[in-house]
Amino acid sequence: MGPAPMVKPRRARRKSRRVWGASAAALVIAAGVTTLPTAPAQADNTISAADQPYFAYYHLDQARAKGYTGKGVTIAIVDGEVDTTAPELRESDIHDKSTCEVTSSASSKTHGTAVASILVSSVYGVAPESSLLTYQIPAPSRGDSASPSCAETQNGLSKVSVPWLLNQAMNDGAQIVNFSASSSLQGDELKWTVARALTKGVIITAAAGNEAMDENSSSLSQWSGVVGVSAIGVDGNRQDYSSWGQGVATTAVGGPVKTHDFATNQIVETSGTSFSSPIVAGVLALARQKWPNATANQLLQLLVKTGLNPDHTWNQYTGYGGIDPGAMLKTDPTTLPDVNPLADKGNGSSPTPDEVQQYADGVVNPLQIVNDNSYAYRGFDESLIADPMVTVPTHLGTSPRYHAK
């Protein structure tokens, strides 16, 4: 899968594959580039709920009628540019929080706008009243470019690297983060970013891929606690393009989805796990609204225990089965264990529970922490006090693990 977003036209999935810069090494810097103005979508170029099969499949009209809209929940996406002038998004609460200036291609804007619309469109979004924070990540192979300010790095990672953007979303208060792209990036910085999410109760959803193969090693879903999402059709069957792997936790409808193609100014039909992933993120937002006293761990327990596989058993193709919004909105998760059911995905998934506790206790080397405004070092390494590369507060010897009774 490589560092590619998962946009897959129905008849040319492999040919449409894009490569996203996920690390400083992959980022192409273009001097003097600024964000291009967004051209308004044509007023008559509209997409309705009836055009989106998933809307009827998940009975989202009934959810809205009962007041389940995701109101009060903040979702983030790390993706292409979102065109908020698209008719279906004009009433949505969307905020571009990109960390630097990125010029998006028509292809990237098509992808980002589609993902955002599935989440919060007032017309056919899963969680239409959630607030959406958007963070642009460039795809150089499609003509995206980033301003020189994006190259300012910490620990060798740019402001458009995956750890930086995920942490920025958490800095800005996101409760759920959707990542409809691939990332084979390893390293401590991403590990501690995921550990932060697990510690702070932020749920990350990630697309499994569209290459009809085991893509665990190139999906963010390989990481402990991340909700990997594969794709089914409205017949409930796994789609032939959908990838699989140890990180898959659930599955959702991946298409066909209608979206604006900004290269042709036409409405096109497409499919992919890029679109099943935000459906899951949106349903989790509905559950977060419905069950405000539940922890993130309990919401994930709810996801697992209401999965549509027989007896909620797990397999690498559909995880615990298709997501069931109706069951998630009827079943009180506060009675479920406050333990993340995805914390150990087997095969040595990372971060381990011990590593998550290291982060929570503040004993992780701060030189491995990137763009995290919540972390403070509380270990005993005095050399870190004077280290100019340390950007987080240091409070030596104050870790709770040293003072536990």
Task: Report each predicted region and the residues it spans.
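Substrate-binding/access-modulating region of protease and related hydrolase catalytic domains
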Residues: S141-S221, V268-S271
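N-terminal domain-start motif of subtilase-like serine proteases
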Residues: D44-I75, T99-A106, D324
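Secretory targeting and sorting signals
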Residues: M1-A43
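C-terminal subdomain of the subtilisin-like protease fold in secreted/lumenal serine endopeptidases
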Residues: D240, W291-A404
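Structural recognition of the beta-strand scaffold that forms the well-ordered cores
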Residues: T74-V78, S131-Q136, M170, Q175-S180, ...
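Hydrolase catalytic cores
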Residues: I137, G254-I323
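Active-site-adjacent substrate-recognition loops and nearby beta-strands
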Residues: L60, A206-V226, S230-G247, K258-S271, ...
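Subtilisin-like serine protease catalytic core
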Residues: R64-I75, E81-H95, T103-N155, S224, ...
